[in-house]
UniProtKB/Swiss-Prot annotation:
InterPro entries tied to this protein: Domain_X (IPR024937), Maturase_MatK (IPR002866), Maturase_MatK_N (IPR024942)
Coiled-coil ranges from the UniProt annotation: none
Alphabetically ordered keywords of this record: Chloroplast, mRNA processing, Plastid, RNA-binding, tRNA processing
GO MF terms, alphabetically ordered: RNA binding
Gene behind the chain: matK
Cell compartments where the protein resides: Plastid, Chloroplast
GO cellular component: chloroplast
Organism: Vitis vinifera (Grape)
One GO-annotated biological process of the protein: tRNA processing
Name the UniProt record assigns to this protein: Maturase K
Recorded family membership: Belongs to the intron maturase 2 family. MatK subfamily.
Function: Usually encoded in the trnK tRNA gene intron. Probably assists in splicing its own and other chloroplast group II introns.
Length: 502
């Protein structure tokens, strides 16, 4: 980032950020390579078999501007990239992904200069959302699960990106690169992009999708804050946008009504909005009529401002007491916790039934078992099986791989209210590890576990379980309540791969 900042300091007199020359800088591809190595994923870090060559990049860009090579074909041997299609597309997308993120990173750094945001790094954690849900949702009544629609055409994203990247050459290169692919909708949808691109080749396309969602957030939350009696303060650190207020005025003209009149229809101090990736949650304490107003408002908002089509019937309004939210790898719900209180006054006794609303989070065991079965750790019924592809590794590497996967899952799902499902996942991974080692040594699982003893089981304990076992005895009621309790961590910045089953 220091090298990038020096590049932009060379020409402070010009206000435009020219990104195109950075494509020919080899350290850009080194940055994308380092980012891939440092990325925290569930399984192994995918190695990088080929080296980025500046000559290859220049030759590829030259071919992109030759019209006779822009021939669309349904065959796997694309005339644009030839036999090295995967390598070229991976290199350009990774490098371009780093480049287009530069203006956003620099503006973010400059916007935070001179501002003190207490513990802002903690707000990056995914788990920071759940304490907010625990605090607010027990007091709310209705909730809507909303899937943010993706753009019908990627040219919409290119046009929106012009407000940030004002370099015409970079935008032209972006168009060339996007037009090479046929199935545009599969690129912009994160889950489908994984099946088309490798795990190291999706950074740029996820950036485009996140940029689209952040554009939606920036305008929607601005209007939401205007409609509230109590303004939101958590959105102050986000970046400002060029021509933002001009777009707001255009959006108001679409409705052909006074802006304040529109906002008056939605005034409600108990409306809450949570979003992660392409899924958002809208919850309210008000009547269903207000939720219906917001539903049709969102549909018109998407169609008129982002030119995307969505049907109101796909946005469902449910009661929180009767509905579970499938969000961020957890099944969350608000349940009633009944309690009976006996009150004695002189000679009269009263029995009072009291029900307390509690926010409950559990691990969805069936989807996670499906993910484990897809990764060949168990069968479809959840019975552990060996991992033959790992049998050639050393015993230490095999155990280390299984332990890291188990601890990552336990760390991410530490906020579960019920630990039974989490213990079942640990059991599957532990026995799968034992079967893999027994397969390698041509032995039985029983004999192998007998030889290793309890040390093998202790490897799968998480750090917090090991710490609790040292601090408190397991027989005490306090220790049992801590083991059953929920833990939210502030160091989780991406959803676990096995939890991302949507």
């Amino acid at each position: 980032m220091e090298g990038v900042q020096r590049y932009f300091k060379l020409d402070r007199s010009r206000q435009d950020d020219f990104l195109y020359p950075l494509i020919f800088q080899e350290y850009i591809y080194a940055l994308s390579y380092d980012h891939g190595l440092n990325r925290s994923i569930l399984l192994e870090n995918v190695g990088y078999d080929n080296k980025s060559s500046l000559l290859i990049v220049k030759r590829l860009i030259t071919r992109m501007y030759q019209q006779n090579h822009l021939i669309f074909s349904d065959s796997n041997q694309n005339p644009f990239f030839g036999h090295n299609k995967n390598f070229y597309s991976q290199m350009i997308s990774e490098g371009f992904g780093v480049i287009v993120e530069i203006p956003f990173s620099l503006r973010l750094v400059s916007s935070l200069e001179g501002k003190e945001i207490a513990k802002s790094h903690n707000l990056r954690s995914i788990h920071s959302i759940f304490p907010f849900l625990e605090d607010k949702f027990p007091h709310l009544k209705y909730v809507s699960d909303i899937l943010i629609p993706h753009p019908i055409h990627l040219e919409i994203l290119v046009q929106a990106l012009r407000y940030w990247v004002k370099d015409a050459s970079s935008l032209h290169l972006l168009r060339f690169f996007l037009h090479e692919y046929h199935n545009w909708n599969s690129m912009i949808t994160p889950k489908k992009s994984i099946s088309i691109f490798s795990k190291r080749n999706q950074r740029f396309f996820l950036f485009l999708y996140n940029f689209h969602v952040c554009e939606y957030d920036s305008i929607f939350i601005f209007i939401r804050n205007q409609s509230y009696h109590l303004r939101s303060t958590s959105y102050g650190a986000l970046l400002g946008r060029i021509f933002f207020y001009g777009k707001i005025e255009h959006f108001v003209e679409v409705f052909a009504n006074d802006f304040q009149t529109i906002l008056w229809l939605f005034k409600n101090p108990f409306m809450h909005y949570v979003r992660y990736q392409g899924k958002s949650i809208l919850a309210s304490k008000g009547a269903p009529l207000l939720m219906n107003k917001w539903k049709y408002y969102l549909v018109n908002f998407w169609q008129c401002h982002f030119y995307v089509w969505s049907q109101p019937v796909r946005i469902h309004i449910n009661q929180l007491s009767k509905h579970s939210l499938d969000f961020l790898g957890y099944l969350s719900s608000v349940r009633l916790n009944p309690s009976v209180v006996r009150s004695q006054m002189l000679e009269n006794a009263f029995i009072i039934d009291n029900a307390i609303k509690k926010f409950d989070t559990i691990v969805p065991i069936i989807p996670i078992i499906g993910s484990l079965a897809k990764a060949r750790f168990c069968n479809a019924l959840g019975h552990p099986i060996s991992k033959p592809s790992w049998a050639d590794s050393s015993d230490y590497d095999i155990i280390d791989r299984f332990v890291r996967i188990c601890r990552n899952i336990s760390h991410y799902h530490s906020g579960s209210s019920k630990k039974k499902n989490l213990y079942r996942i640990k059991y599957i991974l532990r026995l799968s590890c034992a079967r893999t080692l027994a397969r390698k040594h041509k032995s039985t699982v029983r004999a192998f576990l007998k030889r290793l003893g309890s040390e093998f089981l202790e490897e799968f304990l998480t750090e917090e379980e090991q710490a609790l076992s040292l601090i408190l005895p397991r027989v005490s009621s306090t220790s049992r309540s801590l083991y059953r309790g929920r833990f939210w961590y502030f160091d989780i910045i991406c959803i676990n791969d096995l939890a991302n089953h949507e």
